[in-house]
Amino acid sequence: MRPLAGGLLKVVFVVFASLCAWYSGYLLAELIPDAPLSSAAYSIRSIGERPVLKAPVPKRQKCDHWTPCPSDTYAYRLLSGGGRSKYAKICFEDNLLMGEQLGNVARGINIAIVNYVTGNVTATRCFDMYEGDNSGPMTKFIQSAAPKSLLFMVTYDDGSTRLNNDAKNAIEALGSKEIRNMKFRSSWVFIAAKGLELPSEIQREKINHSDAKNNRYSGWPAEIQIEGCIPKERS
């Protein structure tokens, strides 16, 4: 009787195990929607994975500022030249006023004049300060700026060798504190206003002198820049 009872117990166990396996398969088929097996397996694996949060791509600001200027201001950025291959740039309200791409920058002092009321550029000129007598024409150009004008000045290569006293006086009259400190191949940027006052917190000028020990480029100092936001005229 014992062998018979043992065999019967094995049969019952096999049948029970088969029923459990069939029922488990049935439940799995009902729970997983009709989809490729690979997709189902991926879904199961993904249950334990943490969601990956992607940081949004930073929005580009006017003149490549890190933070946006208020809507009631003008954005500007002035960049001096650096070495032979780094040309000076003047950007205003995300418009390149002077730069290598436009072909309107050259050795010396580069100047852009902007109408403060409209925000439109009125004139751009470059003046070679290494060769030729260009201090006189530059002085007249600066003095020709109409009232309520913004003047942006940047150097590329040398801006001091042929810079005479009259030109220095004209730039000094606009508020420059560094024009008389200019040396051979000094990097210099300056923002001025004619017929209006700029806010005191705005950085208006920056200079970097050539130094054989510290020059970034052979014979030239590193380029320098200033940027900021100028309040628009209130209507």
UniProtKB/Swiss-Prot annotation:
GO terms for molecular function: carbohydrate binding; cytokine activity. 2 N-termini have been observed in the mature protein: the first at Glu-30, resulting from signal peptide cleavage, the second at Ser-46. O-glycosylated. Keywords: Apoptosis, Cytokine, Disulfide bond, Glycoprotein, Lectin, Secreted, Signal. InterPro entries: FAM3, ILEI/PANDER_dom. The keyword Glycoprotein applies. Residues 1-29 form the signal peptide. It is found in: Secreted. Disulfide bonds join C63-C91, C69-C229. One of its GO terms (biological process) is apoptotic process. Residues 72-233 form the GG-type lectin domain. One of its GO terms (cellular component) is extracellular region. The keyword Lipid metabolism does not apply. Glycans are attached at N120, N208. It holds the Pfam family ILEI. Highly expressed in the pancreas. Also found in the colon, kidney, prostate, small intestine and testis. Coiled coil: none annotated. Induces apoptosis of alpha and beta cells in a dose- and time-dependent manner. Belongs to the FAM3 family. This is Protein FAM3B.
